[in-house]
């Protein structure tokens, strides 16, 4: 007999393959005994000398910056610098900036040619991996940057920042993001009156193993953008500053202890947007990123700053920080999820994985959370979540599983049908005997204790489950939805096969078919990823 038509099918979804780089926000600085000895011996001599030199440079930079910004509003400027202010800013401050980094031991190698303001009003620097990336700003002639308004109030460096006439961002202003984009566009289209605007389109620091998602703000104006690459080709990496890694003070001290730290700044040809890219900043950002990734010979991923926020949230939930990484840009776009939705799923994931030190869910923990025994049915459900077949579910797989498998199945029709299946005597409530009887059949477990699960659904402790209680529990626990739909499909499959069909083998057929289709969908859509 040919296999029956499957009434329910898993929703087709573009594949969500693992990124080429799992965690671009971690940096493990391992120092050998020789490295420690070298840093100690050089540090005794170099650190005091460099500290004195840097202090002297700052003593010269401070009065120059005061003169440049004298009489200017602290809240930002509305007109570009001209005359002697521009000369002091572009010539003197740039020279002093180079002296400052020279005093820190940096050897700067510049490749390519910086475009003029008319040729490329915006400079995009990547990969952004360190606070030392300010070197790119110095070598670009101190263009304007995007900075928080609070930074202007910082002692000494706040005054230096005012010299570059930054585009200011305010955390307290709800319209700040829109206003920032408008200001960047105004300067970019000024016909060369304003200095170039330098942006770090990744928006956060990575370990330079890939290029993450570029934010669209700097690409909205639709003007030519010059990519600027920054590399640190040193044997000992003392500059990479990531969310998981050494603190800034340690990196600064170790860098000062190095005899020389090499940095390469490369200016690529300006990228002129097509008509389509002018209308779609996302495509323009992706196009520029692709050019930079090709030159750097690095992969690209869809991680973004929101992944860093999820890492912090994972740490607060006692999970390993890397457990929160999901490639937020890809997940949010393909599954139509906002950050708050993913954060909520992280909290649910933490409730299941709290006893697991690795931040991954095993089948035992999955069964314990569902308050069900490990049965073939539950193992099949677990396999649907476990996309890579390694026997565990990480947070990324959990988000995809809940969104693609469970939530679409967790609708009013399914909940009503499932309630009717449990309500054997049709008295509009489910007793523990009815609940236990159906689960024993569905899971293929003769001796099944469902007391704890029944008690959790029975919110008022009345000894029976009403529809409202059942519905509320189902909506808050979408993990059960696939079990419900598989059981409903099982009933229809039995009807097509005939009454003589073995219940357990039919259940296994339905679950296996679902698993095969899910895997097939993932494989067939790899080209779309």
UniProtKB/Swiss-Prot annotation:
Domain notes: The HXXXXD motif is essential for acyltransferase activity.
Membrane protein topology class: Single-pass type II membrane protein
Function: Exhibits both acyltransferase and acetyltransferase activities. Activity is calcium-dependent. Catalyzes the conversion of lysophosphatidylcholine (1-acyl-sn-glycero-3-phosphocholine or LPC) into phosphatidylcholine (1,2-diacyl-sn-glycero-3-phosphocholine or PC). Catalyzes the conversion 1-acyl-sn-glycerol-3-phosphate (lysophosphatidic acid or LPA) into 1,2-diacyl-sn-glycerol-3-phosphate (phosphatidic acid or PA) by incorporating an acyl moiety at the sn-2 position of the glycerol backbone.
Gene Ontology molecular function: 1-acylglycerol-3-phosphate O-acyltransferase activity; 1-acylglycerophosphocholine O-acyltransferase activity; 1-alkylglycerophosphocholine O-acetyltransferase activity; calcium ion binding; lysophosphatidic acid acyltransferase activity; plasmalogen synthase activity
Segments forming domain EF-hand: 373-408, 410-445, 449-480
Pathway field: Lipid metabolism; phospholipid metabolism
Keyword Transmembrane helix attached: yes
Species this protein is from: Danio rerio (Zebrafish)
Protein name: Lysophosphatidylcholine acyltransferase 2
Positions annotated with a glycan in the UniProt record: 207
């Amino acid at each position: 007999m040919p296999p029956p038509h499957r009434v329910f099918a898993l929703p087709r979804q573009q594949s969500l393959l693992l990124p080429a780089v799992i965690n671009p926000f971690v940096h493990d600085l391992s120092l050998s005994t020789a490295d420690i000895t070298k840093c100690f011996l050089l540090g005794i001599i170099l650190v005091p000398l460099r500290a004195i030199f840097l202090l002297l440079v700052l003593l010269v930079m401070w009065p120059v910056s005061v003169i440049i910004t004298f009489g200017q509003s602290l809240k930002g400027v509305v007109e570009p610098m001209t005359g002697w202010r521009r000369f002091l800013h572009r010539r003197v401050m740039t020279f002093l900036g180079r002296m400052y980094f020279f005093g820190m031991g940096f050897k700067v190698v510049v490749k390519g040619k910086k475009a003029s303001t008319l040729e490329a009003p915006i400079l995009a620097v990547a990969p952004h991996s360190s606070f030392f990336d300010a070197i790119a700003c110095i070598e670009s002639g101190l263009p304007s940057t995007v900075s928080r308004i609070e930074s202007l109030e910082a002692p000494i460096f706040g005054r230096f920042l005012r010299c570059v006439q930054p585009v200011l961002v305010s955390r307290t202003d709800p319209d700040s993001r829109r206003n920032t984009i408008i200001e960047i566009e105004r300067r970019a289209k000024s016909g060369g009156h304003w200095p170039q605007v330098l942006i770090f389109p990744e928006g956060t620091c990575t370990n330079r193993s890939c290029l993450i998602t570029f934010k669209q703000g700097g690409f909205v104006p639709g003007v030519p953008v010059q990519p600027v690459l920054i590399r640190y080709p040193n044997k000992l990496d003392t500059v990479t500053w990531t969310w998981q890694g050494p603190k800034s003070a340690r990196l600064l001290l170790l860098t000062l202890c190095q005899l020389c730290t090499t940095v390469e700044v490369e200016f690529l040809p300006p990228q002129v947007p097509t008509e389509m890219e002018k209308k779609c900043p996302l495509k323009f950002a992706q196009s520029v990123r692709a050019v930079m990734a090709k030159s750097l010979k690095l992969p690209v991923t869809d991680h973004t700053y929101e992944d860093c926020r999820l890492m912090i949230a994972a740490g607060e939930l006692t999970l390993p920080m890397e457990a929160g990484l999901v490639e937020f840009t890809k997940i949010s776009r393909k599954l139509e999820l906002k950050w708050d939705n993913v954060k909520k799923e992280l909290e649910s994931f933490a409730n299941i994985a709290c006893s697991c030190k690795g931040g991954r869910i095993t089948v035992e923990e999955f069964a314990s959370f569902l308050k069900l025994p490990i049965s073939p049915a539950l193992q099949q459900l677990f396999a649907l979540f476990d996309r890579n077949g390694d026997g565990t579910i990480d947070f990324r797989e959990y988000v995809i599983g809940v969104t693609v498998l469970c939530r679409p199945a967790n609708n009013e029709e399914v909940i009503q049908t499932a309630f009717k299946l449990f309500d054997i005597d049709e008295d509009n409530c489910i007793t523990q005997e009815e609940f236990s009887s159906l689960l024993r059949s569905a899971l293929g477990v003769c001796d099944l204790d469902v007391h704890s699960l029944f008690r959790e659904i029975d919110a008022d402790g009345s000894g029976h489950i009403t529809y409202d209680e059942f519905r509320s529990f189902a909506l808050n626990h979408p993990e059960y939805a696939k079990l419900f739909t598989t059981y409903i499909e099982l009933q229809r499959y039995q009807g097509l096969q005939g009454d003589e069909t073995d219940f357990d083998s039919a259940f296994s057929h339905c679950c296996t078919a679902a698993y095969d289709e899910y895997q097939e969908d993932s494989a067939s859509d790899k080209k779309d990823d």
